[in-house]
């Protein structure tokens, strides 16, 4: 992206919210990247940023070993916006005063506004989300104080002439209801950055990048049925046409209709070449008698690699035979997203890609150069690009689904009968959530079969002894944390009634109301 988009750099001072800040910048139609606080001023300048945002962080600016802000950053004459710790570090570097006031503010706090570019016209008293012990007590010379709280005499300031500003609170979180507006005003009004980061522009840039990387070569992409691999494949197909071959391994652990969705909807909307590997019997055979969730995952991962490897070998050999020369499928497409890049230490998302990367346990003689067209995108951007490329909503809006599939939503041994039971219950839950218009209000809704548990019930004139089904609806922005979704009672009632009436082996439906933490989203 660097060739065409100058970024706003989010300097990460160890905040759990650095990625969220980058997302909020992009929601304001401005491209952003995360860089570590160890990045030097020279490294920052080399990226030619349009602006710099200093994130929050857990440290005190006075603590030994706390991340420091190099004052030379301000010699670059860039717009700079400080948040929480970044606000304090900015104030200190420019000659202001940061002190231990003895008053800590955590959680919801009232902010009192006194004009300014960023807050002008907004409610003069507004709720914000705070998380600080130290506070700025005197603003640097040239700054106007535009906000105060009970525990922070300087909670917001601006130096409009130098395009510098900052806030003590967290504008990036939903608990600061005017925060996105404040961030947008910094980007567009104070920094003067145009709103040019849009799905159509993103798609055009990514297609050109793939063309430049692949050239006249051939590529392979493993489709999982999920949105990431589907959008990655659609982008590459748009770029190189029938020189892309997609491989879809059906391990029998998918939800109802997902194989058909890939084979029909994806192919129809993209025109991509698709090879389907039917490995249902192979996977179920290997999973026979296995109840330990970690063992399930290992078996599924191993067998998937073997199945994909066999398909890739066949494609490589056929490609070479068709062209009358040595096989030349040089590229492997993966749906890596920006959070994966940041969390693996890639930081800015511009780390060099190894020219021949041995991926995912493939044998050493199958070496590919990675094509990762989504590596600078967040999940919501991937969906937007998918829509821009014309992928059907059934694929683009698909909820996250684990790689091991329904195997880790069956608590107990995985069998064909148990898969059929869970598949039917899951389909009912999804149908009712869609009918109620709740698909986009939840992150995902795992449906879990307690296959090794039976409960007594009464249906008709007789007693039943069936399995419980667990509904696990959760709301989240990034799956790092999640809250259970408060679904309307009438929707829950319809789901429960239909499952217990239509799924023969189930006589009880229960609701999981555990947040993450302490519970994970998936049961296994």
UniProtKB/Swiss-Prot annotation:
GO terms for molecular function: ATP binding; GMP synthase activity. Residues 7-196 form the Glutamine amidotransferase type-1 domain. The active site is at 84 (nucleophile), 170, 172. GO terms for cellular component: cytosol. Gene3D superfamilies: 3.30.300.10, 3.40.50.880, HUPs. Keywords: ATP-binding, Glutamine amidotransferase, GMP biosynthesis, Ligase, Nucleotide-binding, Purine biosynthesis. It catalyses: XMP + L-glutamine + ATP + H2O = GMP + L-glutamate + AMP + diphosphate + 2 H(+). Pathway: Purine metabolism; GMP biosynthesis; GMP from XMP (L-Gln route): step 1/1. Its EC number is 6.3.5.2. Residues 197-398 form the GMPS ATP-PPase domain. ATP binds at residues 224-230. It comes from the Bacteria. Homodimer. Catalyzes the synthesis of GMP from XMP. This is GMP synthase [glutamine-hydrolyzing].
